[in-house]
Each structure stands twice: as structure tokens, then as C-alpha cells.
């Protein structure tokens, strides 16, 4: 009896230390109440670490979210792969995408506004160096994608499903020691779905993990690799039509490559931050302003185009993009504004992205021509 009791105790101890395997949930709506139940991210040795079967990824030019940093991951069921598509990948049922929003912090716990990458390629995020805010999950089920927002507790031990979202008043400190107030909003499930419905009536889709955003190198635990090549090696991507050098690629924000001039940087920024709504089938299609990667330069891209909004919404400026005159362009007015009734994007930020705005202003200033005649 004593031997059996000892064996049972050992088994129980082993079970306590066992990490949750990635959850396959092809259907149903009994979604886990806690993030740990998904098995995608583990708290291990003082770090938030992706599970062994889970791949981290990053984007060339990401969506701005009040200077939050983001740890992105992807997992697919064994033996399943996404099918390549230039505009969208066709992800298999059961795919789970996670995006953890966090801020770096100093030894005194002050949140920092910087662009440094805190991710350890082997271990993930050191919990004593970051403030975890939320983790958003996109789950591919048989009847489509589902968006699930999880909010981290102050102890950074667990994140809980919050259908209604959450609000946090944060203060960031820049390199000069100046404070920046952030009214951080965790979106509710409907807001998540609203932004991710890139084409009206076609349901939720991932916005970030597309070929033009993923086509870049990332530092993995075993060294640098192109993400598209790593996805193929992992068995997560099939049907790629050729070498990655021949595939679409957006500019690398903050560190543009030699072949990425100012116009490409600006267009990549607009694609990532505006194009999911401002495209011919998107929620903002009635504006006639199309800022996605496929849009041709011209009046529908905003050049000398009169805005649909007037008065306060346009800042009394006459055209969306006025060549040579960023201060006469509605586009820069709305990107700079933090007024909820004016600003674009209208969700996901309470501050102005100064670095992104600077790219747009310099690009518009460089454009030849005028809007006369």
C-alpha cells in the first residue's frame, strides 16, 4: 500500500509540473477562461515562453498601438499547413495566432517608450523586464475565425478572458525622461472582429501574418532565418511559388533596407495601419480612399482627392494628400490627431505615432505636382 501511495504521489507531482499542450479547438464556443489553458505560452523560469510547437513571428511594418511591443506566435495542428496566397494565407482549422502586448520597464518598474526588442530568442520575455498587458487570440474554427481578448493580472501569472475588454491608464517614459500618458484600451470581442473584417461581409481574418508582412528575417533560438522559410521548414506553410527574394515584401519600419526608399516606407506604413479598412471591399470603402498595398497611386490613393469628411473631420483641409504640402493634407491631420472623432485609425491608440507621422510628412513633402486645375 505504501508503495502504491508513493507512486500515486509521484504521478500527481509529475502532473503538476506538466505544461499544457497546445489546444486544438476546431469547433464549439466553450473557450478557455484563462490563457494558460491554450498551451501556447508558458511561464517558465521567470519568462513568458512560447511552447516548443509554437513559432514566434514579427512583421516588417506593424500596426501602431500606443507604443506597445508585441510578442506574436502561430501554432497549427500537426500535419496541417497554411496554403500560400499573395493576399491571404488559407489557414487550417485549429490554427491559433497569439499577440501579447507589453511594455518594457526599468529596475524601478517605470514603463518605457522605446523600440528595443526584449525577446530572448530561446526563453521569450523576462517578466522582471516587461509589463504584460493583454494577449489576443485569433482561432480558426470550422465556421471561421474567432477573436478572444485576454487581460493579464498585475502579478503577471495569468491572463483572463475579458469579452468586454478593459481600460488602463498608463504612463510611459521616453529616453529623455519625459512622461507620455496612455489611455490604453483592450478592445472587446466585437471591436476585434470589426477591425479584422478586412472585406465587408467576409468575416474575421488575420491582418498581420501575410506574405508581405512576414517576408523578413527573425532571430530564433538556433539563429537567424527568413520567416517564410522557417514556416515552410516547420510544416506551417505550403504552396510557396518561389524563393522568398521574389515574393512581396513591405519596408522594415525603423530600419529600412537599402532598396526601400521613402515612398515604399510610407506606403508600407499606410498598408499596415490603414489598408485593412481603406480598401475597395473594406469597412471604409465608401470613402473612396484606398491605402492597401494593391492600390495604385492616384486620386483613389488620396492624391488631390477631396475628402468625404468635412469641417472638423478634415481640419478644414481640402484634399487627402496635397503633393508637397503635408500641412495641407487631411491624411496627416487625422494621423496626428488624438481626438476620437477625428483620428485615424479610430481604434487602437490614444497617442500620436510621431515616428510614423514623420515618414508620412516627409513623403508627402517630397511628392511633385500640385492640386490646381
Give, region by region, the residue ranges found by the protein language model:
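Conserved small-residue
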Residues: 19-85, 91-93, 98-105, 116-120, ...
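Sequence context surrounding c-type heme c attachment/ligation sites in exported
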Residues: 16-26, 112-373
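Bacterial N-terminal signal peptides
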Residues: 5-14
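Extended interaction-bearing regions that mediate binding to partners or small molecules
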Residues: 108-110
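A residue-level signal for conserved active-site and pocket-lining positions in enzyme catalytic cores
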Residues: 4, 94, 195
Amino acid at each position: 500500500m505504501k508503495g502504491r501511495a508513493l507512486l500515486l504521489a509521484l504521478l500527481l507531482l509529475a502532473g503538476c509540473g506538466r505544461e499544457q499542450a497546445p489546444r486544438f479547438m476546431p469547433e464549439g464556443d466553450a473557450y478557455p477562461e484563462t490563457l494558460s489553458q491554450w498551451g501556447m505560452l508558458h511561464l517558465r523560469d521567470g519568462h513568458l515562453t512560447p511552447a516548443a510547437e509554437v513559432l514566434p513571428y514579427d512583421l516588417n511594418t506593424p500596426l501602431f498601438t500606443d507604443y506597445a511591443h508585441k510578442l506574436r506566435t502561430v501554432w497549427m495542428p500537426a500535419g496541417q499547413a497554411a496554403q500560400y496566397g499573395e493576399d491571404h494565407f488559407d489557414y487550417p482549422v485549429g490554427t491559433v495566432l497569439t499577440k501579447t502586448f507589453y511594455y518594457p520597464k526599468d529596475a524601478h518598474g517605470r514603463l518605457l517608450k522605446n523600440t528595443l526588442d526584449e525577446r530572448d530568442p530561446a526563453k521569450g520575455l523576462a517578466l522582471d523586464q516587461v509589463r504584460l498587458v493583454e494577449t489576443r487570440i485569433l482561432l480558426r474554427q470550422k465556421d471561421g475565425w474567432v477573436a478572444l481578448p485576454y487581460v493579464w493580472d498585475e502579478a503577471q501569472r495569468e491572463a483572463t478572458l475579458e469579452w468586454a475588454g478593459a481600460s488602463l491608464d498608463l504612463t510611459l517614459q521616453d529616453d529623455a525622461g519625459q512622461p507620455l500618458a496612455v489611455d490604453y484600451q483592450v478592445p472587446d470581442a466585437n471591436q476585434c472582429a470589426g477591425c479584422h473584417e478586412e472585406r465587408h461581409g467576409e468575416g474575421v481574418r488575420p491582418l498581420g501574418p501575410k506574405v508581405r508582412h512576414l517576408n523578413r528575417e527573425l532571430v530564433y533560438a538556433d539563429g537567424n532565418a527568413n520567416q517564410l522559410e522557417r514556416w515552410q521548414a516547420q510544416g506551417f506553410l505550403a504552396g510557396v511559388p518561389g524563393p522568398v527574394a521574389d515574393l512581396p515584401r513591405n519596408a522594415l519600419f525603423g530600419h529600412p533596407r537599402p532598396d526601400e526608399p521613402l515612398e515604399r516606407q510610407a506606403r508600407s506604413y499606410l498598408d499596415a495601419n490603414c489598408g485593412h479598412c481603406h480598401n475597395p471591399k473594406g469597412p471604409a470603402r465608401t470613402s473612396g480612399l484606398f491605402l492597401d498595398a494593391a492600390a495604385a497611386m492616384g486620386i483613389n490613393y488620396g492624391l488631390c482627392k477631396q475628402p468625404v469628411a468635412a469641417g472638423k473631420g478634415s481640419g478644414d483641409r481640402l484634399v487627402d494628400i496635397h503633393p508637397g504640402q503635408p500641412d495641407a493634407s487631411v491624411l496627416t491631420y487625422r494621423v496626428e490627431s488624438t481626438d476620437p472623432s477625428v483620428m485615424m485609425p479610430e481604434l487602437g491608440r490614444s497617442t500620436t505615432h510621431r515616428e510614423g507621422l514623420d515618414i508620412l510628412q516627409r513623403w508627402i513633402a517630397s511628392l511633385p505636382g500640385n492640386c490646381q486645375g
